[in-house]
A protein has these predicted regions:
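Juxtamembrane helix-loop transition segments at the membrane interface in multi-pass membrane proteins
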Residues: 37-56
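Short alpha-helical packing/oligomerization segments
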Residues: 18-43
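Juxtamembrane boundary at the C-terminal end of a transmembrane helix
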Residues: 83-91
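Amphipathic alpha-helical segments that mediate coupling or scaffolding at interfaces
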Residues: 30, 50-51, 64, 70
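Membrane-embedded alpha-helical segments of transport systems
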Residues: 67-79
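Short, strongly hydrophobic alpha-helical membrane anchors
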Residues: 1-17
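Membrane-interface alpha-helices at helix entry/exit sites of multi-pass transporters
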Residues: 56-67
């Protein structure tokens, strides 16, 4: 009887550990996504300031801004995919 109760307790703690691991992974991915959002916001703000100071450079500034934002989005997507893969591996 006691062995059955101990086994049930171990099973529930194992599921809890996997759930907390998945939670930690996704919180980490969320922090990465929030950092990327802040970075893209900084890029956009700086680009608008630069265009306001030097309107004739609008084309090159806009192109560089879009390239940098796309690279950041790519890394963000990569972090999200890795987080999902690790979470699904825990299950």
């Amino acid at each position: 009887m006691f062995a059955l109760a101990a086994e049930a307790a171990n099973l529930s703690m194992g599921n809890l550990g996997m759930g907390l691991g998945a939670l930690g992974i996704m919180i980490g991915a969320g922090i990465g996504i929030a950092g990327a959002a802040r970075g893209i916001g900084n890029i956009g703000g700086s680009a608008v300031e630069a265009i306001a100071r030097q309107p004739e450079a609008k084309g090159s500034i806009g192109t560089n801004m879009i390239i940098a934002a796309a690279l950041i989005e790519g890394f963000t997507f990569f972090a999200l995919v890795i987080g999902l893969m690790l979470t699904l591996k825990l299950a």
